[in-house]
């Protein structure tokens, strides 16, 4: 990507030019407010130093309460924020028994200098939406709802073979409860979302089903090549939803965004506390927050959590990488997100730790070398783990491939690091490492279009 030199500032102490290489957007809430009203903070990234400074006019309202995900389309013109809403008591702890209300997807246009302008609001078909992705072309948007509207666990109505609900119709007679995926097509001129109906499945009343059921208790999902994979598991008593045990595949159509079931059963992973599913550089990574002792590169390693890498086969089937499971850094826990840096040499894993308040010694960033010959394998980068703010929720690499940023929940900050391109070590920025937010961060993304 070529950077456009808008607003170049010349330094008289250096031959370097300083300019904005991209914009970092962080969703979250405001600590001073009890309503959970969401905000989006825009941050300019300096090309030379990685310094963070405010985008004019931000933070702006996210369009609802408790934003949890944001997606920027490939064109960088449209940004979508998923607001989870709040329970009847005003809590952000959305559960099947106490669901959140007034959830929505708010569309923003991205203007000059990274300015965000709210446009329209859209809604999912299910209950408790909490994850959102776009396909690679930016033509389709998908939202994962924790509960389908007629799921027995949510509705309290037990379906029968004579009177099935959507879960049974799509997933088989034993599936009386389920989550769902709401799918949209994206108008490339306006960003407006249009609902995609479930063509293969007809509702019990004969009408088209307006969503795509997935197994009960979903945790996370991702598009992986020609499939959309959903990690599901055991019921979670509170948000965030964890306990992932298996992965269910839908076949994805790039032409129309349609999702089609190719097998009715999930693939068990042999884990009990899956926290996230990430597709990066051709590999599916499942993050699992339970202890493991393993011989890792000829060293017996005991960790509080682990990473399971897979290759996606036909019909979305997962095949474990030959190198087997990967231990998390022994000093960290509760992995929540993973990125592969742009050159494909290093993997970084954000661990939010198992503490939920204040400073968190178990949170930070684990780092790995990637080896692909003779087989895929990871090995720890020397001097890892790397510091972050407390409770990182996400990781992004800046458009110039120099810096890695985390957005942090517990201490309401963004933390930046410089990537050593040879060793993969994440060093401190030459300027201030952190950027203070108005409240806890929940997600982050980066935009490389600066004109």
What do the predicted segments below correspond to?
Residues 15-451:
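Predominantly soluble domains enriched in secretory-pathway, periplasmic, or organellar proteins
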Residues 1-13:
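Sec-dependent bacterial lipoprotein signal peptides
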């Amino acid at each position: 990507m070529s950077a456009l030199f808008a607003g170049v500032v010349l330094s008289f102490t250096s031959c370097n030019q300083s300019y904005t290489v991209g914009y970092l957007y962080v969703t979250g809430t405001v600590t001073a407010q009890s309503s959970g009203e969401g905000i989006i903070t825009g941050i300019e990234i300096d090309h030379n130093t990685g310094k963070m400074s405010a985008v004019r006019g931000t933070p702006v309202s996210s369009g609802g309460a408790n934003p949890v995900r944001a997606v920027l389309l490939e064109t960088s013109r449209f940004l979508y924020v998923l607001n989870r809403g709040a329970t009847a008591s005003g809590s952000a702890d959305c559960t099947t028994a106490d669901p959140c209300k007034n959830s929505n997807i708010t569309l923003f246009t991205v203007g000059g200098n990274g300015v965000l302008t709210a446009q329209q609001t859209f809604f999912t078909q299910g209950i408790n939406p909490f994850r959102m992705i776009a396909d690679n072309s930016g033509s389709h948007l998908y939202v994962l709802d924790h509960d389908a509207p007629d799921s027995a666990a949510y509705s309290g109505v037990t379906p029968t073979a004579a009177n099935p609900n959507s879960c049974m119709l799509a997933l088989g007679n034993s599936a009386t409860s389920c989550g769902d995926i709401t799918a949209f097509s994206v108008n490339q001129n306006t960003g407006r979302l249009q609902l995609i109906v479930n063509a293969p499945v007809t509702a019990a009343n004969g009408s088209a089903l307006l969503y795509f059921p997935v197994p009960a208790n979903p945790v996370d999902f991702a598009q992986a090549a020609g499939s959309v994979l959903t990690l599901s598991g055991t019921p979670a008593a509170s948000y965030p939803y964890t306990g992932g045990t298996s992965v269910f595949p839908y076949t994805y159509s790039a032409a129309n965004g349609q999702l089609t079931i190719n097998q009715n059963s999930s693939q068990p992973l042999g884990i009990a506390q899956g926290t996230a599913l990430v597709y990066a550089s051709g590999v599916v990574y499942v993050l699992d927050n339970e202890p493991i002792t393993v011989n890792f590169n000829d060293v017996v390693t005991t960790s509080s959590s682990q990473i399971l890498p897979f290759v996606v086969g036909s019909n979305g089937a997962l095949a474990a990488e030959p190198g087997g499971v990967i231990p998390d850094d022994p000093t960290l826990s509760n992995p929540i997100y993973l990125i592969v840096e742009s050159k494909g040499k290093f993997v970084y894993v954000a661990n939010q730790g198992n503490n939920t308040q204040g400073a968190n010694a178990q949170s930070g960033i684990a780092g790995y070398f990637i080896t692909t010959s003779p087989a895929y394998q990871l090995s720890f980068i020397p001097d890892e783990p790397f510091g972050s703010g407390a409770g990182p929720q996400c990781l992004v690499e800046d458009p110039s491939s120099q810096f890695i940023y985390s957005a942090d929940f517990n201490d309401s900050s963004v933390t930046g690091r410089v990537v050593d391109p040879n060793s993969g070590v994440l060093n401190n920025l030459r300027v201030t490492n952190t950027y203070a937010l108005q409240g806890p961060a929940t997600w982050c993304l980066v935009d490389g279009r600066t004109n």
